[in-house]
Design a protein with these regions (language model features):
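Compositionally biased, low-complexity repeat tracts
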Residues: 7, 20-23
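N-terminal signal peptide c-region/cleavage motif recognized by signal peptidases
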Residues: 16-18
Length: 140
């Protein structure tokens, strides 16, 4: 094989890798703007997922700079979004993603909300469960 043909074949092979990477497992991005809203999006890359999730966050009424990138998992797996509130008032969301099944996601949430382990919580509940394609599993 001539050097010229080798270079053409090598160039074609290298050019195919970025396209192949986009066909890999999707990830899931979570963004939260405290007291305002949030966003959840699937993406081939963290940049793609977070860009979409920030857009959703802004559409919910938050300012762009208030939309905090909180979680990225690739592959996405099953995800669970948990609301927690401290007895002194502060409240927040905890997200666990990349889990192998819905049952494990719900079990993880149950452990996170175990009041015998976190007796300072006055409220802790699952807000949403997402399947590996980013589809919501709970009615809103």
């Amino acid at each position: 094989m001539s050097k010229r043909l080798q270079c053409v074949v090598l160039g074609a092979a290298l050019a195919a890798f970025p396209a192949a990477a986009q066909d890999g497992p999707k990830g899931i991005a979570f963004v939260r703007a405290p007291e305002q809203g949030g966003g959840v999006c699937m993406g081939a890359t963290p940049e793609e997922g977070f860009s979409c999730a920030v857009k959703q966050c802004v559409e919910s009424g938050a300012a762009d700079e208030d939309c905090i990138r909180t979680n990225w998992c690739q592959p996405s797996g099953w995800s669970v979004d948990i609301f927690a509130q401290h007895s002194e008032g502060p409240h927040w969301h905890e997200v666990i993603c990349g889990l192998p099944s819905e049952a494990i996601a719900r079990a993880a949430a149950a452990h996170v909300c175990d009041r015998s382990e976190r007796d300072y919580l006055i409220e802790c509940a699952v807000v949403q469960v997402y399947d590996p394609d980013g589809n919501k599993q709970m009615e809103e």
